[in-house]
Amino acid sequence: MMPGDWSAERLSDRLQIQEVLYRYCAAIDRIQSGALMDNVFHTDALIDKAGAPYPVAEFVAAVAARHPGVPVASHMVTNVLIDFIDRDSAFVESWCLALERHPPATAEGGTIDRVYRVRYGDRFERRGAGPWRIAARTFILDHVQSSVVDFALEPPTGGRIEGRRDADDAIVRMRVSLGLPPV
């Protein structure tokens, strides 16, 4: 298949691949390990963050262990480039901007806000009649910016719904109430 194939079938494939990228962000931001395994990665996928690929299950376990200590996180994927290798595999480059707030940096308080610019180099595969999923992901870290912040969001006084990184998040509750999966 040519990288520039814009047939109806390929447009559908492109949208399905983009949906997987968006579901990755939602699963990471809500710390939904099950959604990462069910909706994003093939179970035998490999992750490469430092030149030594390892199983996706280890990555998911590390996310589950690390992210509860990060009270605020937001991952946004953009600049998605999809090149089809053949009918059922594609190379996908995307950019991710991740914003994270980390616990107090000093004994005096304050938090650390970090902005990460990351590129993902993904090999997507559609196996059999199954959905598109990531078979291999390489993380390329382009930039990290850290800032100590000496203020925090004021406690809610009404009229505001605050986001959460767990099953009590308002969107998760809305989805579940409609019979949809959390992510």
Regions found by a protein language model. Give the residues of each.
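Extracellular/periplasmic carbohydrate-active domains that bind, remodel
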Residues: 4, 21, 63, 95-108, ...
